[in-house]
Amino acid sequence: MLNKILLGLNKNLTKIIKTFIFFWLLLCVYRLIFIWGMSEYLSADSGHNLILTAIYSGAKLSLQTAGGLTLCMLIGFIAETIWHRLKYFRYICSFVILFITTLLFVARFPFYQQFHSGFNQMLFTAMHEDLYALFISLVEEFQLPLKLLLVIVLVAILNYAFNKFLAYSFKVKRWQILPEKIKTVSLLMCVYVLGTLSLYGGGWSWKSGVNWENAGITNDTFLNESILDDYQAIYRAYANQMRMEACNGLSFSAQNVRDLAKSLTNKDGGNDLSVYLAKEATGAKIEKPKHIFVIVSESYANWPLLDKYSNLHIADNMKKIIAEDDTIYTSHMLPSGSSTVGALMTMVTGMANSNLYLTTMPEALANPYITATAPQMKNLGYETSFWYAGPATWENIQEFTLAQGFDNFYSRGNIDPNATGSVWGADDEYLYDAIFKQIDDNKMTFSVILNTSNHSPFNIDLEKEGFDASKVIEGLPDKEKNNQELIKELGHFWYADKMASDFINKVKAKYPDSLFIFVGDHADRYNIDKVPTMYERYSVPLIITGKGIQKDLLPEDMAGSQIDIMPTVIDLIAPEGFTYYSVGKSLSENKLGQSYAFWITADAIGNTDDLVEKPQYFNREVLPDRTVLENYINGVRAISWWLGKYGTIIDEALLQ
């Protein structure tokens, strides 16, 4: 009896494994055909190695898809086990799955030709179109009936081959003589391995696997799109759409926005935000630099720079730069959001966090906002570039930055292919090396740099990089001296600190007429204290260094957030009368900063919900005026929300 049960189980386990292999191979073959059939979209410098990289990464990612399709087939297998005649239901299941898979594959060709992308959010846009007109267009322009017929014929052949493959018994003598128990254990182990690889996209954990967000590892847009099979592309479209729909922003009336804009800017711009946000430079404070680098550093919190933690020695290198005469540093700075994407959106658009997912919003992908960074730096004569250590597909970063006016975008695919790194991107040293090699002294250049090394999975070979763990251990509290995970995290902060300072010093030596702005993208990841103060937990440093910078160029009581960084840069370098647009203000006059949940001054920090009711002091016990603080917080949020969703004209009708 047991042997009979095991025999039946083994037959089903074998079918599951065969199904997985068949679907995975089919997805891989479809990918190869797509790359071959659309090879004209390959960039000129995409060689065989890059194509093989895309094929390999796509094969890993399709393990996940194959697992999902195999789970769908379980319905048919279970039905057939209950009653043998229900095998015809299994045939129907396989036909439906193969039909959808093949139909998507065929549809991908015209979709890419039209949109230069795999399936994306245009699928959801199409739902709001005239469906009848869309259907007629598909029939007339894309020969829908003929292509459907071809798909049905191809699927019939594939379905026949699939079911023959399931029924075929491989005659392996050594396998046949094994006891059924051994076969069961072996097959279960095989299913476990395939299931794990499927779950993590070709890896043993999320750290080594591939998913749709980190798949864009080449510098070829077409190859990055080919890595995603059609199901993964549709999931990407769905995920981005859900993010966008979940982030409808705040809620202000048109009159609220007008009143808050007046309060924030002391102007009466009527219904035109461009009037409220326009600013005029008073004249350059320093000689216009040839090259400007804005380094947005992953998880670079301010607390390691405090004297309180100097015995850890994890921020010594940036401290040396801070100590130099040509450097300004403030700790009275807040990030826009709690994650990297918040900093990305603010540094690119100049707008505060208003619960809008700008990287995927159609409005943000159509034209640059008037407050966008890149167009305003281009007006000052700079060629603008955005550098990201990770894949071009993360958070739609390539499309977003280019749509917001950057001349160039560089990502993992533009960095040494042999560079070490993690699933998030190349290690910082390779990122900075690629940027250094790209500097063209015949041009005025402006570069925003977003690194990734100070981020889990924390897999850098710190010993090889020269990290002395004993120094950190010596400075840790006794209860943390054996906390290897914390030591590794602090080691990665040390690495990010060292690589940034090395880059700054190297560029200064060769290109002395350069300006550097260094800021953490966010804090709040790890602290020594289990219950850190708000100031230690949430503040990030702002460091401005380079030719012409003097420590008294900005006031000591300045305070702000990431919306104030670019106005500060423009205020330092722009000629008198230069007009620019910003939600934030230059730190030469700004004394307040706000983020997604907090406010800060040169003396105190608090929660935006509580305003001045529950402050924490880190300097003098001085608080901002409650009404001024409330209007400031609401003002930058309301303006950013309206500008992000509706543009510059304040009109109640747009809310309908």
Predicted regions and their residues:
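Transmembrane and membrane-interface helices of multi-pass
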Residues: L2-C247
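Alpha-helix initiation and N-capping motif
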Residues: L26, H128-Y132, L228-Y231, A254-R258, ...
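Short amphipathic alpha-helical patches
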Residues: A79-F89, H116-A126, D130-V139, I157-F165, ...
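Short alpha-helical "patches" and their helix-cap loops
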Residues: F89, A246-N256, T360-L365, V583-K585
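Short coil/turn linker and secondary-structure boundary residues
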Residues: A126-E129, D229, M244, F252, ...
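The feature marks either
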Residues: D220, I227-A278, E324
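Solvent-exposed soluble domains appended to multi-pass membrane proteins
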Residues: T265-Q656
